[in-house]
Amino acid sequence: MTLPRRVLCVITDEHSNPVELARMALQGGAGMVQLRRKTASGQELYEWAIRIQALCSEQQALFIVNDRVDIAMAVHADGVHLGQQDLPASAARALLAPDAIIGVSVSNATEAIKAAEEGASYIGVGHIFPTFSKDKPSEPLGTASIRPIGRAAQLPVIAIGGIGHDNAAEVIRAGASGIAVISAVSDSDDPETATRELVRRIRQ
């Protein structure tokens, strides 16, 4: 399965109804939805995942699950996104369908190369700008990091961290294949319109 160019990945937050957020993001043109809820039970994630997978299928968008390979397998999601402390990409690749999309979060070239060697489909590079989505964020990498890290891995880059309407196009110009956002959509009064505007910015 191939990652679309200039894709917008909307990640569910810790507070919104993930199914409704996914629905509005898809109506706004998101090409990928990632289910992420660190505090949810396996049962909750499974039930949400079934419904979001159906919504994504209707819109011909990709659906990936954060961390939980078992949930991704159970609902036949398009793939998973893994952090540095999660199951290695190679282990996830052995469990999932051969064409599954596997993303790995990285913050430097060493991690990026390792992700590529383990079979990642793309790397999530960040955080690019200051962000409030993490409890104790490190220093932002900046847009200048995108191209070198992507070249080191020879993989598509989805940039994340502090990305919104004002800087989305800049991130794409810096070499990212796409962007991932949380608060830029979830904190909006109109998530559908916020998504549509982000899509317009990264494709202009």
Curated annotation (Swiss-Prot):
Q: One Pfam family name from the record? A: TMP-TENI
Gene Ontology CC, one term: cytoplasm
Binding positions (4-amino-2-methyl-5-(diphosphooxymethyl)pyrimidine): 34-38, 66, 105, 134
Give TM segment ranges. Answer: none
Q: Which GO terms describe its molecular function?
A: magnesium ion binding; thiamine-phosphate diphosphorylase activity
Which cofactors does it use?
Mg(2+)
**EC?**
2.5.1.3
Q: What class of enzyme is it?
A: transferase
Q: Name one GO biological process term.
A: thiamine biosynthetic process
Q: Which reaction does it catalyse?
A: 2-[(2R,5Z)-2-carboxy-4-methylthiazol-5(2H)-ylidene]ethyl phosphate + 4-amino-2-methyl-5-(diphosphooxymethyl)pyrimidine + 2 H(+) = thiamine phosphate + CO2 + diphosphate; 2-(2-carboxy-4-methylthiazol-5-yl)ethyl phosphate + 4-amino-2-methyl-5-(diphosphooxymethyl)pyrimidine + 2 H(+) = thiamine phosphate + CO2 + diphosphate; 4-methyl-5-(2-phosphooxyethyl)-thiazole + 4-amino-2-methyl-5-(diphosphooxymethyl)pyrimidine + H(+) = thiamine phosphate + diphosphate
Q: Which residues bind 2-[(2R,5Z)-2-carboxy-4-methylthiazol-5(2H)-ylidene]ethyl phosphate?
A: 131-133, 162, 182-183
Which NCBIfam families does UniProt cross-reference here? thiE
Purpose of the protein: Condenses 4-methyl-5-(beta-hydroxyethyl)thiazole monophosphate (THZ-P) and 2-methyl-4-amino-5-hydroxymethyl pyrimidine pyrophosphate (HMP-PP) to form thiamine monophosphate (TMP).
Q: What is this protein called?
A: Thiamine-phosphate synthase
To which species is this protein native? Chlorobaculum tepidum (strain ATCC 49652 / DSM 12025 / NBRC 103806 / TLS)
> What's the source species' lineage?
Bacteria, Pseudomonadati, Chlorobiota, Chlorobiia, Chlorobiales
